Amino acid sequence: MPTINQLIRNGRSKIAKKSTAPAMQWGYNSLQRKQFASGGSPQKRGVCTRVYTTTPKKPNSALRKVARVRLTNTIEVSSYIPGIGHNLQEHSVVLVRGGRVKDLPGVRYHIVRGALDTQGVQKRMQARSKYGAKRPKKGK
């Protein structure tokens, strides 16, 4: 426990908050071939380099759909493909947002459904905006 004199002399140091989506903090200058701190983006565009399934951590069991994506700032990240079924393959252009998947180690990003080459989830009636699904026709 510090004395009051020690606190007056040095004070308390602030703990810097680490970003949960560090790849979103960088931009890329293609002319100089350099990365630079851009202050962060809400989403970034990228190209799928590999689309695969992986298994979650211990208590859970499933085949989670994941894509390895090279972003426009040249950083390569693993991102989760939400929803049932997808049309992604290698060289698909996708939009990536932050947001980790708790039971998949190393997956800190989500692919945005219904943007660029990614189709929305078919026959999705609830929480449609999260899965890029269009509003169903009135008659059906």
Curated annotation (Swiss-Prot):
<comment type="subunit">
    <text>Part of the 30S ribosomal subunit. Contacts proteins S8 and S17. May interact with IF1 in the 30S initiation complex.</text>
</comment>
<comment type="similarity">
    <text>Belongs to the universal ribosomal protein uS12 family.</text>
</comment>
<keyword id="KW-0694">RNA-binding</keyword>
<feature type="compositionally biased region" description="Basic residues">
    <location>
        <begin position="125"/>
        <end position="140"/>
    </location>
</feature>
<comment type="function">
    <text>Interacts with and stabilizes bases of the 16S rRNA that are involved in tRNA selection in the A site and with the mRNA backbone. Located at the interface of the 30S and 50S subunits, it traverses the body of the 30S subunit contacting proteins on the other side and probably holding the rRNA structure together. The combined cluster of proteins S8, S12 and S17 appears to hold together the shoulder and platform of the 30S subunit.</text>
</comment>
<dbReference type="InterPro" id="IPR006032">
    <property type="entry name" value="Ribosomal_uS12"/>
</dbReference>
<feature type="region of interest" description="Disordered">
    <location>
        <begin position="120"/>
        <end position="140"/>
    </location>
</feature>
<dbReference type="InterPro" id="IPR005679">
    <property type="entry name" value="Ribosomal_uS12_bac"/>
</dbReference>
<comment type="function">
    <text>With S4 and S5 plays an important role in translational accuracy.</text>
</comment>
<dbReference type="GO" id="GO:0019843">
    <property type="term" value="F:rRNA binding"/>
</dbReference>
<dbReference type="InterPro" id="IPR012340">
    <property type="entry name" value="NA-bd_OB-fold"/>
</dbReference>
<keyword id="KW-0488">Methylation</keyword>
<keyword id="KW-0820">tRNA-binding</keyword>
<dbReference type="GO" id="GO:0006412">
    <property type="term" value="P:translation"/>
</dbReference>
<keyword id="KW-0687">Ribonucleoprotein</keyword>
<feature type="modified residue" description="3-methylthioaspartic acid">
    <location>
        <position position="103"/>
    </location>
</feature>
<dbReference type="GO" id="GO:0000049">
    <property type="term" value="F:tRNA binding"/>
</dbReference>
<dbReference type="Pfam" id="PF00164">
    <property type="entry name" value="Ribosom_S12_S23"/>
</dbReference>
<keyword id="KW-0699">rRNA-binding</keyword>
<keyword id="KW-0689">Ribosomal protein</keyword>
<dbReference type="GO" id="GO:0003735">
    <property type="term" value="F:structural constituent of ribosome"/>
</dbReference>
<dbReference type="GO" id="GO:0015935">
    <property type="term" value="C:small ribosomal subunit"/>
</dbReference>
<protein>
    <recommendedName>
        <fullName>Small ribosomal subunit protein uS12</fullName>
    </recommendedName>
</protein>
